[in-house]
Amino acid sequence: ESLVHGDFRLGNIIVNADGLQSIIDWELAHIGNPLQDLGWVCGNSWRFGQNDKVVGGFGELEDLLEGYNSISKLKVNKEMVKCWQVFGTFRWGVICLIQAYAHLNGTINSIEKAAIGRRVSETEIDIVDLLFLGGE
């Protein structure tokens, strides 16, 4: 187990010409399996149309695995990341449902929450693709 960010994706990474500057939004951090962050950043929801770039819409899975394996004692392969990608996609779907429910029951009056709630169907398709159609 290790420290897991919990929402590791491009929107929470600050870079400039000098490279990585910061990783922000640690409110979902917890102790857990570090592969959760790898699966999360590979989720289709964070690719924003760049579906050929499995890692956050900007990188190749092979490069991520090579880099990770070069510095980690834990050796990771595609199948391990895919398991956590399925978990992360399911988790995002549940988060979408919670956001929609908060809007619908009046807890949070927010068009943003309602719009996020509509993304549940995307996670359903992504899980079917990952489990049955050979998706990455």
Model features per residue range: what roles?
Residues 1-36, 42:
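Active-site acidic catalytic loop and adjacent metal/ATP-binding pocket
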Residues 23, 59-77, 122-123, 127, ...:
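Short amphipathic alpha-helical segments and their helix-coil junctions
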Residues 23, 33, 87, 120-122:
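Residue-level recognition of hydrophobic positions within alpha-helical transmembrane segments
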Residues 29-32, 58, 110, 114-117:
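Short, conserved loop/turn and helix-capping segments at secondary-structure boundaries
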Residues 35-73, 87-105:
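Active-site activation/catalytic loop segments of kinase-like enzymes and analogous catalytic loops
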Residues 51-52, 78-80, 106-112:
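Short, surface-exposed loop/turn segments at secondary-structure junctions
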Residues 75-87:
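All-alpha amphipathic helical-bundle segments outside canonical DNA-binding/catalytic cores
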Residues 105, 110-136:
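Regulatory N- and C-terminal appendages and interdomain linkers associated
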